[in-house]
From Swiss-Prot:
One of its GO terms (biological process) is negative regulation of DNA-templated transcription. Residues 36-59 bind DNA. It comes from the Bacteria. Residues 14-76 form the HTH iclR-type domain. Coiled coil: none annotated. GO terms for molecular function: DNA binding; DNA-binding transcription factor activity. In conjunction with SrpR represses the srpABC operon. Residues 89-253 form the IclR-ED domain. PANTHER family: HELIX-TURN-HELIX TRANSCRIPTIONAL REGULATOR, ICLR FAMILY (PTHR30136), HTH-TYPE TRANSCRIPTIONAL REGULATOR RV1719 (PTHR30136:SF35). This is HTH-type transcriptional regulator SrpS.
Amino acid sequence: MNQSDENVGKAGGIQVIARAASIMRALGSHPHGLSLAAIAQLVGLPRSTVQRIINALEEEFLVEALGPAGGFRLGPALGQLINQAQSDILSLVKPYLRSLAEELEESVCLASLAGDKIYVLDRIVSERELRVVFPIGINVPAAATAAGKVLLAALPDETLQAALGEQLPVFTSNTLRRKALVKQLSEVRQSGFASDLDEHIDGVCSFATLLDTYLGYYSLAVVMPSSRASKQSDLIKKALLQSKQNIERAIGRASKKAP
């Protein structure tokens, strides 16, 4: 095989991967499954091409058939990969969570985005008498929390608009309305840092930064009583951004450009 043939082979392989990813994204948007014709229409590929790629994905359990009724949906192997990635991120970030919690003497958490909410993957609760306590696994509105804002700010504009919807729920008198939030998210994209000042729960503030890792985007947040927030905001921002740098250096960044 000459160099030209090798380059053509590489280009073809990349195209197949891109098409497979497009098909999996289409199925991800339709958890109940899609027919071959529907998939082909959504991804803009011939049905025969979709069939070949689906067959290959099915062999790896990344896609599964729906049965006699026909159609396909995402397969169990994808969930296993996601669980493995989450296990990896938890074990890798845990020491940094502990260090940050000890340094600031406040509750800290690691979260991911799930639709219009954040999902708390792990947390360290402060040992101070006046503290904020929250469970692992809790789902919290992304638009009203610092952890959610940094994750929303990382989304492409079209995806962000869909995630926010037409109207945002109001939780407190400080909850940002849609226009104000969109403006703030633009600033968060530049700074990589966000705050929530009594926007979700009265008396509770949070500060967060985005973790850009090869395992995906996550947020690292400090959650604390509002009574201590204003005096410590600069210290917290500095500590969060330092932790972000340490974590991304240890794990590896997904992108070269800072958020």
